């Protein structure tokens, strides 16, 4: 089935990445049928999504309601963005993360299996499955082990990947696991609507705009400037990668399971991110306070996305400055006006 005729289900479509993805999806394929499953009745994305998007408020932990809803939607393609994603919170509430991320995914798979038809599933995984990997940049062919992930969030995604890879031995599922590194930027007017986000860049931008203190967690890592180093990817580049993965899977029907790293291949320290933001907001000065490290944060995460470039023809094009400037526009022009 061609992309333009597909029925697409987006789980977590009212969240940051999910809503940006729908925006990019409809720009490229305006005639696809899009349905969303989410639990966030108050998401600002509800005010922005076009009327053609059908939104269903269903908790993935309610298997009966989820099964009924998916039977009604009868999707051909599923993009699974729904998850709890805070590393810090996962160390405090590990069972909650296993429930939402692992059990929720299992319930989704049960519901999709009931359709008794082939399904293409694109799973939002994470760099956290690698933990503090000793090989940098982190290659896609690194053998995942349960002990590799350094926090319950990463473990929940690792276990989900194992389940998905096992299920692709059946004829019903084709699965692509897309391992995100740090996502930033916006697909304006869509962006990170989460008022309680723990991500560095939105909190940094809000600190500048609201003239409040920004907390830097850890300046004593074994890195070039003592702060964590992360690989960042613009959310629009990330969405483009999902659409390229879909097109690639359509052209390769014999593929059962594949995983791709999605990042820029370049590491930026927290101090470098702060300095880039400082240049955007100059002459405004950041109020900064250094705190102790957060539990579960590896010192360095940088990706090798050679396979994504080779197979998907994926090449991120948006710089760190572009990520910060787009997200600044989102918070200035859209976030506080909704």
From Swiss-Prot:
The keyword GTP-binding appears for this protein: no
The organism's place on the tree of life at top rank: Bacteria
Catalytic activity as recorded in UniProt: UDP-alpha-D-glucose = UDP-alpha-D-galactose
NCBIfam families given in the database record: galE (TIGR01179)
Family of this protein: Belongs to the NAD(P)-dependent epimerase/dehydratase family.
Primary role: Involved in the metabolism of galactose. Catalyzes the conversion of UDP-galactose (UDP-Gal) to UDP-glucose (UDP-Glc) through a mechanism involving the transient reduction of NAD.
Protein name, entry field: UDP-glucose 4-epimerase
């Amino acid at each position: 089935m061609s992309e333009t005729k597909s029925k697409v289900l987006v789980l977590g479509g009212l969240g940051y990445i999910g809503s940006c993805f729908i925006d990019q999806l409809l720009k490229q394929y305006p005639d696809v049928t899009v349905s969303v499953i989410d639990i966030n009745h108050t998401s600002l994305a509800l005010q922005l999504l076009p009327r053609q998007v059908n939104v269903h408020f269903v908790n993935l932990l309610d298997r009966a309601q989820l099964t009924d809803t998916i039977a009604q939607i009868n999707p051909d393609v599923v993009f699974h963005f729904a998850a709890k994603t805070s590393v810090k919170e996962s160390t405090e509430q590990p069972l909650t993360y296993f429930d939402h991320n692992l059990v929720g995914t299992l319930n989704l798979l049960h519901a999709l299996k009931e359709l008794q038809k082939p399904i293409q599933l694109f799973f939002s995984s994470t760099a956290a499955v690698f933990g503090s990997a000793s090989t940098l940049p982190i290659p896609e062919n690194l053998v995942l082990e349960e002990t590799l992930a350094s926090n319950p969030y990463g473990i929940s995604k690792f276990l989900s990947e194992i389940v998905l890879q096992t299920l692709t031995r059946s004829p019903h599922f084709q699965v692509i696991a897309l391992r995100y590194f740090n996502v930033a930027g916006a697909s304006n007017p869509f962006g990170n609507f989460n008022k309680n986000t723990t991500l560095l860049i939105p909190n940094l931008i809000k600190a500048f705009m609201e003239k409040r203190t920004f907390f830097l967690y850890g300046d004593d890592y074994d890195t070039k400037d003592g702060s964590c180093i992360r690989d960042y990817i613009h959310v629009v580049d990330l969405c483009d990668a999902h659409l390229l993965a879909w097109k690639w899977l359509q052209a390769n029907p014999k593929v059962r399971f594949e995983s791709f790293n999605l990042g820029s291949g370049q590491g930026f320290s927290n101090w470098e991110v702060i300095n880039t933001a400082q240049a955007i907001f100059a002459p405004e000065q950041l109020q900064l306070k250094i705190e102790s490290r957060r539990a579960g944060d590896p010192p360095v995460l940088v990706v090798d996305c050679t396979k994504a470039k080779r197979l998907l023809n994926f090449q991120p094009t948006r710089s760190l400055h572009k990520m910060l400037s787009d997200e600044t526009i989102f918070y200035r022009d859209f976030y506080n006006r909704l």
